[in-house]
Amino acid sequence: MGFGRSEDRVDVGTVAPHFTLPSQSGEMVSLEDFLGRKPVVLYFYPKDDTPGCKREACAFRDDYEQFGGLDAEVVGISSDSVESHRSFAENHDLPFTLLSDEGGKVRQLYGVPNTLGLFPGRVTYVIDREGVVRHVISSQLAASRHVEEALEALRAIG
């Protein structure tokens, strides 16, 4: 199984792979913590405090009330450390969970591709209450598009 090949990617209609990772507070968080209760917007991003990632995180922050109004949980994942996530969340007042995937095992599990073969990709999954992937957004450069499309997908699945 190759890393990030299209045939390895989690796609619409498939059950989202389960995982457990440490959050910015050091607490272990599992996808199962949300399933059965609320949909999850799971967004993979390249790196804390880079311009595009900061824009994307702040866009999720700015629309966080809309996600809450749709009873959805936003969760960000990158390979940065717990400490890096803590600082990133505090510096930008991020109200949602950031998970540390050091080593990239969950990124690989989801088949998130690298951009130009070098940089971790930017992919967002909208996962319904039952754990089924309902929408996938993949755009390295249009970070704010992830937020807009995730909200549209959540509205569509009700």
Task: Write out the residue ranges for each language-model feature.
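Chalcogenol-based redox active-site neighborhoods
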Residues: M1-G158
